[in-house]
């Protein structure tokens, strides 16, 4: 029966390349799913991707297996999802950081990153003693630029004479998982006088926050 089918449907979550223990975006999703399982007694399927090609494969595999809903973490799932979702009209899909797909069985979850970052910028601007603050982004995409722009606007709101140094880690998905590069960028920013750093960089942010702690400056993290 229909009700039996719904009762048996198991949700699935597909983590992005950082993996579910990235101390950031994916791990937050995993902890939320785990909490759901603990509170309801339910179970969920999961997979950690090893490479880009697996996105569509994992989506199709879970959909074929009857998983419902299928949740994805990250904008890189937009293209594979736009191909797969129409083939499984009875499956519900949800994807974080994608809000431009108009498909009846897809729920996009987007955020006003610039607004929260504006408040973060105000904090940074008020806390800085040098008048120089910095930002480390992960992959250079519009989403992360929204973080950076909101932050800079917030800094300027409390200190119009402040300097904001902004760096992106890279232009490929590897930029989310490069704590060594995050550390190097932070050291360079500190050498230019930055005494508050804001990271919106996934696993790369671990390197930013650790370096800030080691060097004795303030840091602000997000998505973790």
Short names for language-model regions:
Residues 1-7:
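Gram-negative bacterial Sec-dependent N-terminal signal peptides
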Residues 7-224:
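A residue-level marker of the well-folded mature domains of exported/periplasmic proteins
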């Amino acid at each position: 029966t229909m009700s039996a089918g719904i009762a048996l449907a198991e949700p699935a979550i597909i983590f992005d390349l950082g993996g579910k223990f990235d101390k950031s975006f994916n791990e937050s999703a995993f902890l939320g799913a785990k909490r759901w399982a603990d509170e309801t007694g339910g179970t969920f399927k999961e997979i950690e991707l090893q490479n880009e090609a697996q996105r569509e494969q994992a989506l199709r595999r879970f959909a074929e297996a009857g998983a419902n809903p299928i949740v994805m973490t990250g904008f890189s799932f937009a293209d594979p999802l736009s191909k797969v979702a129409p083939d499984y009209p009875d499956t519900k899909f949800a994807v974080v950081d994608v809000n431009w797909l108009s498909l009846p069985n897809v729920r996009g979850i987007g955020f006003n990153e610039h607004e929260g970052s504006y408040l973060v910028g105000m904090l940074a601007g008020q806390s800085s003693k040098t008048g120089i603050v910095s930002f480390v982004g992960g992959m250079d995409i519009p989403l992360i630029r929204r973080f950076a722009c909101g932050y800079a606007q917030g800094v300027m709101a409390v200190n119009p004479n402040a300097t904001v140094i902004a760096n992106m880690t890279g232009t490929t998905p590897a930029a989310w998982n490069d704590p060594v590069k995050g550390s190097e960028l932070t050291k360079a920013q500190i050498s230019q006088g930055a005494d508050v750093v804001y990271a919106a960089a996934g696993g790369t942010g671990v390197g930013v926050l650790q370096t800030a702690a080691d060097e004795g400056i303030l840091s602000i993290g997000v998505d973790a």
